[in-house]
């Protein structure tokens, strides 16, 4: 019987996951996403007046219901419910996002679930996250999903695997050095690898992500209007689409902050360059992640003699790579043995 392998990548901005694998090729992997927001409520919000037709799910955790899903912004209040800190994976919000993704995968059992971590915390939190993901997950509405085994990967490693697989370069890159740059919502991650083997000493992440840029612009708007401006999602949309914002019926152009945005991007790239040392032996510079468009100029300046490789739908590069790695792992004898040993299913909160 074919094993069911799925992947989920909970970022600070968006939760990405695999919904299907089509014909089995990397290009056939189907992905989806929703904002990484989880709004708590003492009662099931799916039963509340006005929630009909809303594409969200109520995930029960610890006596509360956390509303997550594509239309979660319709459940938002004035407070932007995010949990952006180093212990993010230990929060009920994180678990609610994972379980929301599991719910949308529409499977009852997953033999191998592949998840990701920022590079800086990968070694410290890998075992804990794999344990947290394994077991029976209550995904709401009387449904549950059983995960038999979990595998955690460093987030940019997924993008490296995705790039090498899609371009049929896995063997060709075996002795070549690659640098994967992954600007996310909270962290700016990078990964150095020879072939598919990571160089942990050169790989890392710093807290210089898209959220820093959005907050910088929000602070400027706040000074202009004389009161706090907190709608970071509107700023993000305007930046991605090259649009102006309407604030109190007046137009505000985020492009005016471009020089300050570039300083943040250069700070992140400079931190990376100090860590990796010289770039003369780097054959592949791969830029991925939802924040790539904000950091592209700084990356090109740092690697002026290199071609910067970009990918289609860069936001999903990591989760596609997780799926490829998980599918390959599930075909190994080691995976079969582990599955037989771990056949019992744990129960509880994030078992």
Residue ranges of each PLM-predicted region?
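PRPP/pyrophosphate-binding module of the type I phosphoribosyltransferase fold
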Residues: 190-195
């Amino acid at each position: 019987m074919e094993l069911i392998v799925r992947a989920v990548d909970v970022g600070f901005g968006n939760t990405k996951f695999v919904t299907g694998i089509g014909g089995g090729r990397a290009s056939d992997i189907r992905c989806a996403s929703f904002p990484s927001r989880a709004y708590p409520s003492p009662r099931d919000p799916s039963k509340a007046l006005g929630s009909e037709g809303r594409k969200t799910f109520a995930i029960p955790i610890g006596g509360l219901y956390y509303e997550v899903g594509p239309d979660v912004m319709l459940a938002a209040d004035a407070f932007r419910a995010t949990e952006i800190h180093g212990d993010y994976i230990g929060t009920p919000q994180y678990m609610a996002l994972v379980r929301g993704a599991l719910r949308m995968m529409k499977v009852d059992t997953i033999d191998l679930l592949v998840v990701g971590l920022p590079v800086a915390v990968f070694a410290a939190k890998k075992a804990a996250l794999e344990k947290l993901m394994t077991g029976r997950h209550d995904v709401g509405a009387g449904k549950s999903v059983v995960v038999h085994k979990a595998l955690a990967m460093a987030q940019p490693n997924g993008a490296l695997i995705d790039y090498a697989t899609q371009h049929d370069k896995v063997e060709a890159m075996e002795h070549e050095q690659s640098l994967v740059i992954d600007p996310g919502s909270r962290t700016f991650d990078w990964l150095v690898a020879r072939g598919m083997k990571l160089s942990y000493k050169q790989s890392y992440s710093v807290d210089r992500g898209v959220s820093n840029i959005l907050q910088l612009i929000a602070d400027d708007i706040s000074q202009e209007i004389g009161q706090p401006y907190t709608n970071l999602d509107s700023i993000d949309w305007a930046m991605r689409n090259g649009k102006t914002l309407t604030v109190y019926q007046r137009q505000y152009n985020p492009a005016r902050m471009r020089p300050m945005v570039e300083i943040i991007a250069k700070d992140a790239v400079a931190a990376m360059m100090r860590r990796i040392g010289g770039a003369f032996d780097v054959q592949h510079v791969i830029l991925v992640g939802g924040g790539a468009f904000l950091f592209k100029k700084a990356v090109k300046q740092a690697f002026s003699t290199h071609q910067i490789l970009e990918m289609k739908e860069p936001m999903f590069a990591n989760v596609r790579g997780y799926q490829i790695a998980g599918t390959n792992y599930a075909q190994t004898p080691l995976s079969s043995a582990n599955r037989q040993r771990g056949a019992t299913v744990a129960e509880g909160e994030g078992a």
